[in-house]
A protein has these predicted regions:
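Basic/polar, cationic surfaces and motifs that engage anionic cell-wall
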Residues: 118, 123-220, 232, 236-239
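Extracellular LysM carbohydrate-binding repeats and other cell-envelope/extracellular binding modules
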Residues: 243-246
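Short basic-aromatic helix/loop recognition motifs at nucleic-acid
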Residues: 224-226
Length: 246
């Protein structure tokens, strides 16, 4: 696949099809940082849903210069992968974001958009073809950039006060069985026992501290009340690890 990068007046070849048995195509997005990034900066994979009424409108937005948004890849409903921005350039997909001590995940991540109307336009299950393609693409990227399991995140993990994607229908548990991302291994009986316990202020604070330890940011938007922000963080955690509560 050839990327004709008008901004930097160069051509980059990324032949995914030789590394993966999946269909890929190219649809150039002009929305990325002009400066090429070092491979060592790529430590995260961020999953998103497109959150638009139609797939075509999502593709148009990701490739329109006025939108000032992009991702490295988009996975269509039929499982076909569109390459939008080369991995070696910073795409504009994370926005205001934070994880652990990092503020601004764009520079350090690969962004993958998955076609889905999202919560505003009729959120639906992701198709089997989409997930199959996502698994193959993720394995390729994990191997190439040595991405750790705990560095595979959703947009809502790094921007809990702003984003809900990829949402509670995203199959994190299924992906973890393919060595993509984390999932708790605690016994279900123990989980039920713990969940039946009443939570007091002390245990609530301990729970929040553990979320911050995992990586959820203490960063606070000055316009958002602290307690409200904490609720956003808890909801982000639940969307991923306890989706049945959402």
């Amino acid at each position: 696949i050839l990327y004709f990068l008008k901004k930097c007046k160069s051509v980059i070849c990324l032949n995914l099809s030789n590394n993966m048995s999946i269909n890929t195509s190219f649809n150039y997005s002009p929305n990325f940082d002009e400066k090429k990034r070092n491979k060592k900066y790529i430590k995260y994979i961020l999953f998103h849903y497109t959150g638009m009424k139609s797939e075509n409108s999502a593709i148009n937005r990701l490739t329109k210069i006025q939108s000032e948004v992009s991702s490295h890849y988009l996975i269509k409903n039929n499982g076909k992968i569109i390459s939008l921005v080369p991995d070696s350039y910073t795409a504009w997909h994370a926005g205001v974001s934070s994880w652990k001590k990092i503020k601004g995940l764009n520079k350090y991540s690969i962004g993958i958009e998955i076609s889905n109307p999202g919560h505003k336009h009729g959120y639906k299950n992701f198709s089997k073809k989409q997930i199959n393609s996502l698994v193959k693409l993720s394995h390729f990227l994990i191997k190439k950039y040595k991405i750790k399991k705990n560095n595979i995140l959703g947009h809502s993990d790094v921007s809990p006060e702003r984003k809900m994607d990829p949402g509670e229908k995203f199959p994190w548990k299924k992906l973890s069985k393919k060595n993509i991302g984390l999932w708790p291994l605690i016994d279900n009986k123990k989980l039920i026992k713990f969940r039946n316990k009443k939570c007091n202020k002390l245990t609530e604070n301990k729970f929040l501290k553990n979320l911050f330890k995992i990586g959820y940011s203490r960063y606070l938007d000055k316009e958002i009340n602290k307690n409200k922000y904490h609720m956003f963080v808890i909801e982000a955690f639940q969307r991923r690890f306890r989706p049945e509560l959402i």
